[in-house]
């Protein structure tokens, strides 16, 4: 949830791949990419209480940036994460990325509350949404797009070797004491 004159919600890594939804001091929204800026539409203005969203398909590299459950791309508000159409940007798939929020500058106080699925009320500032992903994980204000999961460890695949599994690391590694068959230790 945003309360800022300047707000940026972004997905980035150390390479040239980066994208962000930017709410500037005039309240106009734009998508910023590493190589420049594209204006979404002149009639779209952000305001206090807006909810900004990121849906990232790491297999295809498609990033969907949204505000109040509408997903944008440059020149249109027709992004559909569930069908994979009209992403805000397509970036290099299968890399490590960071998600961030930045509030900066301007004449008013800025701030934001980030919900990765822990509290759809945004610390009591909204009525609870009560939406979870397909695995029943999370508490989101808006419904999670079909095919997307909350960003958390409980949505990672189970490991095949580990403390909670029937297969243990020491099943594959063992110490064997060897006693030589001859007096000089050769075998």
What residues fall within each predicted segment?
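Polar, enzyme-active/binding microenvironments
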Residues: 1-187
């Amino acid at each position: 949830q945003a309360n800022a004159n300047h707000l940026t919600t972004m997905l980035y890594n150390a390479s040239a791949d980066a994208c962000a939804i930017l709410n500037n001091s005039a309240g106009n929204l734009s998508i910023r990419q590493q190589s420049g800026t594209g204006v979404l539409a002149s009639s779209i203005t952000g305001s206090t209480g807006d909810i900004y969203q990121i849906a990232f398909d790491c297999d295809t590299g498609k990033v969907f940036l949204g505000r109040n459950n509408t997903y944008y791309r440059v020149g249109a508000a027709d992004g559909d994460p569930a069908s994979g159409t009209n992403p805000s940007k397509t970036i290099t798939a299968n890399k490590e990325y960071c998600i961030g929020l930045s509030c900066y500058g301007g004449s008013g106080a800025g701030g934001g509350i980030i919900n990765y699925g822990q509290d759809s009320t945004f610390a009591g500032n909204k009525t609870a949404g009560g939406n979870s992903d397909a695995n029943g994980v999370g508490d989101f204000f808006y419904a999670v797009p079909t095919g997307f999961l909350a960003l958390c460890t409980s949505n990672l695949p189970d490991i095949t070797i580990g403390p909670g599994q029937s297969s243990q690391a020491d099943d594959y590694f063992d110490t064997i004491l060897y006693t030589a068959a001859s007096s000089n230790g050769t075998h």
